[in-house]
Design a protein with these regions (language model features):
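Acidic, polar-rich low-complexity tracts and alpha-helical solenoid repeat scaffolds
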Residues: 1-240
Length: 240
């Protein structure tokens, strides 16, 4: 009876999952897991974790990914568990957990370039959150080689910001000039780069150059975010 019902529940759960009836699928996968039948355990944890993650229930998903990691034999599920743990840790603001999960994921032998870049990005951000900025440099340098990606564009800006925070204006300036030269489709991070460049000029006492960059950005940036306020704030201070 038990084996039959877990067979049936797994089959019905898979149908519900395929039909995008996620609540029913989660209920049925949970029943399979509660039955103690090991035949469908790995796939049930994988699907349950995926449903919880898509539902933005990151705390529950994190627990399910931990269970999946413990039982996974399929290489795809092993990688999915590590990736899921890393993403959930980052999304729930747990840098230490995110760092451990990223390191674990980066040990996987056949990661795609996109996943490798994401793991390096998460690791770098975790180091920055943990006030270990210097440990983030290697990852930021690597990811920022490709500013076509959102992670690459943000990494380029963060790299310059770290140099600026360390009072190394020359290197920060070089990174930003390279960013401007190479460009990026991610205009928000390029705009943050322009503002940081203006901050460098302000610190160096070159208010004229700072104003030029800020005014140019003000006239050309079309995004609806905090960039406009950041420009106003700096231009206001330059007028004093």
């Amino acid at each position: 009876q038990g084996a039959f019902s877990s067979n049936a529940n797994f089959y019905l759960a898979s149908i519900a999952f395929a039909k995008k009836d996620m609540e029913e699928a989660k209920r049925l996968f949970s029943l399979v897991l509660e039955s103690g039948d090991t035949k469908f355990r790995e796939e049930s944890w994988a699907r349950k974790a995926e449903i919880e993650y898509l539902d933005k229930d990151y705390a529950a998903a994190m627990e399910s990914f931990k269970h999946l990691q413990a039982v996974a034999e399929n290489p795809e599920n092993k990688e999915a568990a590590k990736l899921g743990l890393m993403r959930c840790a980052e999304l729930t603001g747990q840098p230490q957990e995110a760092l451990l999960a990223a390191n674990d994921l980066l040990k996987e032998p056949k990661l795609s370039p996109e996943i490798m870049s994401e793991a390096r990005y998460v690791r770098a951000k975790a180091y920055i959150s943990l006030k270990q900025e210097n440990k983030a440099l290697a990852d930021l340098k690597e990811i920022s080689k490709d500013t076509r990606t959102i992670h690459g564009a943000e990494a380029k800006y963060l790299l310059a910001q770290l140099y600026y925070d360390n009072k190394d204006d020359t290197t920060a300036q070089t990174v930003l000039m390279n960013f401007i030269e190479n460009g990026t489709p991610h205009q928000y991070w390029l705009a943050r780069g322009f503002i940081l460049l203006a901050d460098i000029y302000i610190r160096q006492g070159d208010d004229f150059q700072a104003r030029q960059y800020l005014t140019s950005l003000q006239n050309n940036y079309k995004g609806d975010d905090e960039i406009a306020a950041m420009i106003e704030d700096r231009l206001g201070k330059l007028k004093k």
